[in-house]
């Protein structure tokens, strides 16, 4: 019985978080009641899982960042050459960023758990960029902290390209990953 209750609680938390992402993306000031309605749950159920709006925002931040970590690890970056790994990680991360667009693009609560997950994301990214540098994809004297910042900016900008909403194919994570990696490694200069 306890296991069924736990599974039910996990499902309702997941439904609340997914509904919160959708609702808050449309209206950042949405109420807990609106989120509950979108999740198909009562307001009391939402409040049972999250004491207040801040607790819900904190859970959103942790959930989205955990999904980024999972996406990076799913790409198995150590099992392929740096270029292949960078492409896989980028495509996976773009999928998560598209799904959690509100949470990952807004300043969310920086709990200890969210901060630890962000440190893990940074560590994975720096490890991958270090491998890319060792394999000659990045200049030997490239500043990897700056390169990491540029990479993160490219990820965000790829999802927010002007006119992308008119061309759904342009939002395909595989297409965007190619764009991000090509821009990161070659900039806007000639490719020859």
Regions found by a protein language model. Give the residues of each.
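Short secondary-structure transition hinges
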Residues: 55, 95-127, 137
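All-alpha amphipathic helical-bundle segments outside canonical DNA-binding/catalytic cores
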Residues: 84, 116-117, 134-151, 171-176
């Amino acid at each position: 019985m306890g296991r069924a209750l736990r599974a039910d609680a996990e499902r309702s938390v997941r439904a609340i978080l997914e509904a919160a992402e959708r609702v808050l993306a449309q209206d950042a000031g949405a109420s807990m009641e609106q989120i509950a309605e979108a999740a198909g749950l009562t307001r009391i159920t939402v409040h049972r899982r999250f004491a207040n709006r801040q607790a819900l925002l904190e859970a959103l931040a942790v959930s989205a960042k955990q999904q980024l970590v999972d996406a990076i690890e799913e790409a198995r970056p150590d099992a392929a050459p740096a270029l292949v790994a960078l492409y896989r990680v980028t495509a996976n991360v773009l999928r998560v960023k598209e799904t959690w667009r509100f949470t990952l693009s807004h300043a969310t609560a920086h709990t200890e758990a969210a901060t630890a997950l962000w440190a893990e994301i940074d560590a994975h990214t720096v490890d991958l960029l270090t491998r890319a540098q060792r394999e000659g994809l990045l200049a030997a004297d490239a500043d990897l902290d700056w390169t990491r910042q540029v990479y993160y900016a490219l990820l965000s900008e790829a999802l927010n390209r002007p006119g992308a909403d008119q061309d759904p194919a342009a939002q395909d994570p595989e297409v965007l990953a190619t764009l991000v990696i090509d821009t990161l490694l070659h900039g806007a200069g000639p490719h020859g």
